[in-house]
Amino acid sequence: MSAFTPREVVSELDRYIVGQNAAKRAVAIALRNRWRRQQVDDDLRDEIHPKNIIMIGPTGVGKTEIARRLAKLAQAPFVKVEASKFTEVGYVGRDVESMIRDLVEAAIALVREEETEKVGPRAEELAEDRLIELMQGGGVKSSSATPPFGFAPPPPPPVQRVSDSAREKFRAQLRAGTLDDVEVEVETAESSPTFMRGFSGQGMEEIGVNLQDLFKNVPGMNKTRRRRVRVPEALQLLRKEEAAKLVDPDRVQREAVARAEMNGIIFIDEIDKIASREGGKGGGGPDVSREGVQRDILPIVEGSTINTKYGVVKTDHMLFIAAGAFHVSKPSDLIPELQGRFPIRVELEPLTGEDLVRILREPKNSLLRQYTALLSTEGVRLSFTDDAVTELARIAQQANESTANIGARRLHTILERLLDEVSFSASEMGPRDFQVDAAYVRERLAAIVQDEDLSRYIL
């Protein structure tokens, strides 16, 4: 669990997100409260539940990015879902419990990656040893191969032992890259059959059954495939296989489930789309289904147990962050019980022209830095003058005001239109400097500025 102070969290979020200080403070406090909870005595710890957050603001102002960056900062399992994709029980579609299963899968991947990184040096050494034996005439067999039913496993082929001096010589050549062009033949385990993947869907996860685990010991299901590859790829395949042997899957599963339960973050986007305009008091129509989804979400947010293929998962201490534009509906249109489960309400401000200028300049991964890095691969040294950046922000703001306000996402299509010509011709231009000024911006984007009807077709 991250021990960042709220001020440090806000400072870190400032590197990627412009403005929205109220939302940053809210998520920073929520993250710190998780750390504080871990320091509390055991008898009180289970009684402290996270305070869920609902973000209200137009699209493109940073709601999703704040939640995503927070999860990375906390090194916590994170999943983003859209409330409008869910249907209530009895209707065709995704059920709300799938968000918990997705979170556990994200936690499994996160913990497995951490454990694989820990055993990386040892796996590298073992992979090199196997590759050296292979190149000296030995065999490399996959440990997951299963003999046909009724037959004893074949005896292992004789392996020509390599002396320590020869082994170190080969190892030095491997690491120096002098053997990169050599081809070797290795056996690798095949992935699960296609028909098995077709049966491992949502229905089986609901009852906590993983068919691939059930059938993994059936004779003939685990097959290997012989491949002829170059040494670097062979080393990568063997490294992956050795790392899988060194990582304890049971430990990964236990740690992942615990981390999902205690540190998991679920971002529920478009929650305004399931808000009934009558506040749940209306009659039939689609509002019935909307309210049904809300009532299905309610026990998960309150705290319940969900069956997954990795076991039972409790949702009592997961942090839920909901977000919505609420252009048509309003937060009070959600059912009262669900409103009460999101006690922290934060309103995000629409982006101004000054905000768009800062978004182009300040973030660590700003769009201008991205385009500059992309074109530098072709030898084109792209640069933007200050007046060009200001003009870009002004045009984006004007387009947002005259058509739909999509916030910072407008900058993506504005820049694509601006740099269309240089992106197309960069490979033919050769190494050169290319400066974008305000005059060039107005020239390239004149049609968007002058024709308001045309701008309605531009995202």
Curated annotation (Swiss-Prot):
Positions of transmembrane segments: none
Q: Name one GO biological process term.
A: protein unfolding
Per the record, its GO cellular-component terms are: HslUV protease complex
Q: Where in the cell is it found?
A: Cytoplasm
Protein keywords: ATP-binding, Chaperone, Cytoplasm, Nucleotide-binding, Stress response
Instruction: Indicate which residues the UniProt annotation says bind ATP.
Output: V18, G60, V61, G62, K63, T64, E65, D269, E337, R409
Which Gene3D superfamilies does this UniProt record tie to the protein? 1.10.8.60, P-loop containing nucleotide triphosphate hydrolases
The record ties this protein, via InterPro entries, to: AAA+_ATPase (IPR003593), ATP-dep_Clp_protease_ClpX (IPR050052), ATPase_AAA_core (IPR003959), Clp_ATPase_C (IPR019489), HslU (IPR004491), P-loop_NTPase (IPR027417)
Is the Protease keyword given for this protein? no
What coarse category fits the chief subcellular location reported for this protein?
A: cytoplasm
Which superkingdom, per the lineage?
A: Bacteria
Pfam family of this protein, just one? AAA
What assembly does the database describe for this protein? A double ring-shaped homohexamer of HslV is capped on each side by a ring-shaped HslU homohexamer. The assembly of the HslU/HslV complex is dependent on binding of ATP.
Name the family: Belongs to the ClpX chaperone family. HslU subfamily.
- This protein is called what? ATP-dependent protease ATPase subunit HslU
